[in-house]
Amino acid sequence: MNVKNQIILALDVEEKNKAYEILDQTTEYLDTIKIGYPITLALGPSIITSIKEEYDVKIIADFKVADIDATNEKIVKTTLNYGADAIIVHGFTGEDSVLACKNMAEKLDKEIFLLTEMSHPGADKFLKPVSLDIAQMGVDLGIKNYVAPATKIDRLKKIREVVGKDSFIISPGVGFQGGNAKDTLQYSNAAIVGRSIYNASNPKKALEEIIESIKV
């Protein structure tokens, strides 16, 4: 997956008007949007289709799929059929659950991103001890796309070492959570930014400043 300007917008708002206002200001510089539960639960999964049709962007559904294999397969199928280009899945559920997601996505000519470790402090207790194992499982299963934290550069570096230089990593946590876009992109292919853009008084300017900071 190619990502324009190496920035993915995490559109974690709940109102359609606000979402469209932000997209109106930012899609000149962005071509990839991450949509999660806040907007999907508020407006229904058809919002994926609407945004896809209105703005012609790539959409990553951040649903952190984490169930048994049969249920995962249904979640992935339904989500991708609404128009998402990819879906994020948890790795801690194990090989069978992850493989169900991968196989369904491939059947629909779409992609999955395997979540190795999360960006918030609480992830250190349970996910951190197994994140490299999750990454290695992904490699063994032939997965090419991963999620790894921008807030923990040392962990991001280690995950990159496991998955290899040809894998595609996207990293949440840039901005409000403390991650730095330029530092993140030493090891990641794209930085995910949410509140620093959608909560800004001028989202377009905020995005421009982030893009400029990468180039410096």
Swiss-Prot record:
Cited Gene3D superfamilies: Aldolase class I (3.20.20.70)
Metabolic or biological pathway: Pyrimidine metabolism; UMP biosynthesis via de novo pathway; UMP from orotate: step 2/2
InterPro entries reported in the protein's UniProt record: Aldolase_TIM, OMPdecase, OMPdecase_arc, OMPdecase_AS, OMPdeCOase_dom, RibuloseP-bd_barrel
PROSITE patterns: OMPDECASE (PS00156)
Transmembrane portions of the chain: none
EC number: 4.1.1.23
Keyword entries, A-Z: Decarboxylase, Lyase, Pyrimidine biosynthesis
UniProt cross-references to Pfam families, sorted A to Z: OMPdecase
Enzymatic reactions: orotidine 5'-phosphate + H(+) = UMP + CO2
Recorded GO MF terms: orotidine-5'-phosphate decarboxylase activity
DNA repair as UniProt keyword: no
Active site positions, chain numbering: 64
Keyword Lyase carried by entry: yes
CDD domains named among the record's database cross-references: OMP_decarboxylase_like
Biological process, per Gene Ontology: 'de novo' pyrimidine nucleobase biosynthetic process; 'de novo' UMP biosynthetic process
CC terms in the record's Gene Ontology section: cytosol
Binding residues annotated for substrate, in chain numbering: 12, 34, 62-71, 119, 172-182, 194-195
Subunit description: Homodimer.
Function field: Catalyzes the decarboxylation of orotidine 5'-monophosphate (OMP) to uridine 5'-monophosphate (UMP).
UniProt similarity note: Belongs to the OMP decarboxylase family. Type 1 subfamily.
Protein name per Swiss-Prot or TrEMBL: Orotidine 5'-phosphate decarboxylase
Originating species: Methanosphaera stadtmanae (strain ATCC 43021 / DSM 3091 / JCM 11832 / MCB-3)
